[in-house]
Amino acid sequence: MFLKKYQVKVISELKAFYGKSRETKDSFDTARKALPAEMRHTLNWVQTTFQTAAKEYKDRCTNGLGEYYPRIIMKVPTGGGKTLLAVEAIREYQNLFARKRTGLVVWIVPSETIYSQTVRKLRDKANPLRQLLDQASGNKTLILEKGQRLTTHDIEENLVILFVMIQSISRQNGKEALKVFQDSGGFVSFFPSD
């Protein structure tokens, strides 16, 4: 599959960002070990990555453990190959930052049409986009939709792409739309046993 010139430029920028992120995170992880526990939270490798890459940074992303993580947004025009760029971004992330073939990607889409088209494409093992994902995962790609069972084992052993429609997680659409947050027992493996 051939990328257009602007897509090559976008992926090139993304690769540079992932490489710089990995380098900065590794050096901060080393420095963090030398600090007392109460000071470790002050090291923000994400902010430093953006500063050294001369990219504007305003976000302060932390996970549930208070650890920093990078988040990026790509604006691509209609017909600009958003799905292809997303697949390439996942591949480069796996190779340059995560340095592993497994993990979880939450793929959020804006409409039912795009949702069904993208899920259909990426479930088809003959589709070039799916083949690119399979290359990145060592042929261990799982395409899941909201409501399907997901375990820690799935994420440890596969590259899991979890599709969600933005409307299904929006408070503006009422209680019925928020069923994504309802306990179904499908995520039990993510919590320690009592």
Describe each model-derived feature in a short phrase.
Residues 1-194:
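RecA-like P-loop NTPase motor core of helicase/translocase proteins
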